[in-house]
Amino acid sequence: MARKSLIQREKKRQKLEQKYHLIRRSSKKEISKVPSLSDKWEIHGKLQSPPRNSAPTRLHRRCFLTGRPRANYRDFGLSGHILRAKVHACLLPGATRSSW
């Protein structure tokens, strides 16, 4: 299980990303429309003004149950060992164990 502080930090980053999402998107559109280089530099300065943790690349996908940051399956939102345990216990609909 991940530490509670790391999970809270990730939630804080998600809130910041949602808050500044429109500002980042509009600044990127402005950069593509403006022809002069000096204006692009000014808009680029605006793009750097939001907090660093509001960037979408700072977000990390975590396991829904344990908070584990690695080996996550997007379809289920679970880490590998939790997914395996749930499938073996028949708690995930549509997931079957492989047999050949």
From Swiss-Prot:
<comment type="subunit">
    <text>Part of the 30S ribosomal subunit.</text>
</comment>
<keyword id="KW-0689">Ribosomal protein</keyword>
<dbReference type="InterPro" id="IPR023036">
    <property type="entry name" value="Ribosomal_uS14_bac/plastid"/>
</dbReference>
<dbReference type="GO" id="GO:0006412">
    <property type="term" value="P:translation"/>
</dbReference>
<keyword id="KW-0687">Ribonucleoprotein</keyword>
<keyword id="KW-0694">RNA-binding</keyword>
<dbReference type="GO" id="GO:0015935">
    <property type="term" value="C:small ribosomal subunit"/>
</dbReference>
<dbReference type="GO" id="GO:0003735">
    <property type="term" value="F:structural constituent of ribosome"/>
</dbReference>
<keyword id="KW-0150">Chloroplast</keyword>
<comment type="similarity">
    <text>Belongs to the universal ribosomal protein uS14 family.</text>
</comment>
<dbReference type="InterPro" id="IPR001209">
    <property type="entry name" value="Ribosomal_uS14"/>
</dbReference>
<keyword id="KW-0699">rRNA-binding</keyword>
<comment type="function">
    <text>Binds 16S rRNA, required for the assembly of 30S particles.</text>
</comment>
<dbReference type="GO" id="GO:0019843">
    <property type="term" value="F:rRNA binding"/>
</dbReference>
<keyword id="KW-0934">Plastid</keyword>
<dbReference type="GO" id="GO:0009507">
    <property type="term" value="C:chloroplast"/>
</dbReference>
<protein>
    <recommendedName>
        <fullName>Small ribosomal subunit protein uS14c</fullName>
    </recommendedName>
</protein>
<dbReference type="InterPro" id="IPR018271">
    <property type="entry name" value="Ribosomal_uS14_CS"/>
</dbReference>
<dbReference type="Pfam" id="PF00253">
    <property type="entry name" value="Ribosomal_S14"/>
</dbReference>
